[in-house]
Amino acid sequence: MRTLHVDLGERSYPIYIGENLLGDARWFAPHIVGRRVAVISNETVAPLYLETLLKALQGHEVTPVVLPDGEAYKQWETLQLIFDALLKERHDRKTTLIALGGGVIGDMAGFAAACYQRGVNFIQVPTTLLSQVDSSVGGKTGINHPLGKNMIGAFYQPQAVVIDTASLKTLPSRELSAGLAEVIKYGFICDEPFITWLEEHMDALLALEPTVVTEAIERSCAAKARVVGADERELGVRATLNLGHTFGHAIETQQGYGVWLHGEAVGAGTVMALEMSHRLGWLSAAERDRGTRLLRRAGLPVVPPAEMTAEDFMEHMAVDKKVLDGRLRLVLLQGLGNAVVTGDFPREILDATLRTDYRALADQLGDE
């Protein structure tokens, strides 16, 4: 078992990473302040792991709240089901919420914790690779709006993150690849040696070799913790964690939430960010292609939806949290391992990026 820390003064918290942590009270008891707990999960994860988690919560009065599964349910109506259950069972301010599931459950349970009686404690128990390496760490919580992804929410930190790597054994391969999009992101934005490590270990990651998976999660969480510790509320460097996300969120919104998995959209969006960085003269063609190959090896789409036009992208990208004073800002790369957030780019470069034939670029890479 490995422990990392997110350093935020009085709101600091541990990240526990290991196998078979879910049923062990040691990782939960120190972070539960009262007698009552509400476990927020979904119809896919609860049958797999709720019973195991309940073993760690013996001695507490537990209310399970099982929600529909999927990005399409990351909305106000589903959030209301959490509040309904908490109020019906008379949960008070000493209640601890536990998010048992992927990113959707973590985001909604965290937002519910931020809102319920103006704030109660919560613990993240992420069960997908994407949520383990990204969304469970850093305190971003919220729901989607029909006009934009994650536009309603709050910064609200958990008391702990408990990452049981054994939960990945039941993860579908498509979800595993989606999580690898966020793992690869850390190499692209701040850790070029990690890119080389991922190239060398991608087959082992896809095969879920335990030591390799644990190292990938630890390195990803350590990078996320450093960035969040330096910029909790995304006023500066934390925005670099959104590499590929502005393009990716446009894909998710246009296609309908849940049609493309978040990580899949980030994968294609990252290829677009690589291409734009190349067009600006910040990345060589070889670096662009290296990044694209790694994403493709992870099983991610490297071509955005063929039916999406440049105008479609611009319509959705205008509703983005990084837009300031009406100006679109993007996360781009000035070399692999060096991300920047900028709105200082020629509009024609962005337009050319949106109109690029990504299928032709992918075909030029050839087979692995």
Swiss-Prot record:
Its cofactor is Co(2+); Zn(2+); NAD(+). Gene3D superfamilies: 3.40.50.1970, Dehydroquinate synthase-like - alpha domain (1.20.1090.10). GO terms for molecular function: 3-dehydroquinate synthase activity; metal ion binding; nucleotide binding. Transmembrane segments: none annotated. GO terms for cellular component: cytoplasm. It catalyses: 7-phospho-2-dehydro-3-deoxy-D-arabino-heptonate = 3-dehydroquinate + phosphate. GO terms for biological process: amino acid biosynthetic process; aromatic amino acid family biosynthetic process; chorismate biosynthetic process. Binds 1 divalent metal cation per subunit. Can use either Co(2+) or Zn(2+). Belongs to the sugar phosphate cyclases superfamily. Dehydroquinate synthase family. This is 3-dehydroquinate synthase. It comes from Pseudomonas aeruginosa (strain LESB58). The lineage of its organism: Bacteria, Pseudomonadati, Pseudomonadota, Gammaproteobacteria, Pseudomonadales.
